[in-house]
Design a protein with these regions (language model features):
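C-terminal accessory domains/tails appended to large, multi-domain proteins
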Residues: 1-188
Length: 188
């Protein structure tokens, strides 16, 4: 009798079974790489499919293990430049303080674009870090082994951050004297 449906499913499987037992038949696609401060590394999503059937749509993966160069770029841009990293490397806090000082100078001069952009900052870090540094653990391990002279080379100077040269401090004083009164001046 072929008029009746006898079974809706003949062989139900769990996706994990196919992923574990058939790795040679699986297609993997990686997407959405981003910096995860809590994990201290670049993470992404992996879509796993078997002959077009999606078994795992968004499996979290350590992106740096798969694509170290791209992870290194993201690490420099989203972790180091922004300071969104929990690191023991002391240069980063000093660089962020120097950047704040440069932004203050930019406000004094009332000139947008006085400070180097984030792309320059990221490239500056990339030029000084070895290729294997693309996560917090690797940064801390590498930085911890550096001699003091090499650690100092990772710190920005004020002149590094200013595009148009250093300002004239006399033109933009931090204090203004009116008679016997000394007033603090803030530039916005």
């Amino acid at each position: 009798d072929t008029e009746k449906v006898w079974s809706m499913t003949n062989a139900a499987i769990e996706p994990e079974w196919a992923i574990d037992e058939l790795p040679h038949l699986l297609a993997r696609r990686h997407h959405d790489p981003h910096w995860a401060r809590s994990q201290g590394r670049v993470v992404g999503s992996e879509q796993i499919s078997l002959f077009g059937l999606v078994l795992a749509p968004k499996k979290p993966v350590h992106y740096g293990a798969l694509f170290p160069e791209e992870s290194r770029q993201i690490f420099a841009r989203d972790a180091l430049v922004t300071g969104e990293i929990n690191t023991r490397a002391g240069f980063l806090q000093r660089n962020l303080a120097m950047l704040a000082r440069a932004r203050e100078e930019e406000a004094k001069q009332r000139r947008a674009g006085l400070i180097v952009d984030e792309d320059w900052q990221a490239q500056w870090y990339l030029d000084r870090m070895p290729p294997h540094v693309h996560n917090q653990h690797a940064l801390d391990a590498w930085y911890g082994k550096l001699p003091a002279a090499e650690k100092a080379k990772l710190e920005w100077s004020f002149d590094d951050l200013i595009v148009g040269g250093v300002s004239d401090a006399e033109r933009f004083p931090k204090h203004l004297r009116l008679g016997d009164v000394r007033l603090a001046v803030n530039y916005r």
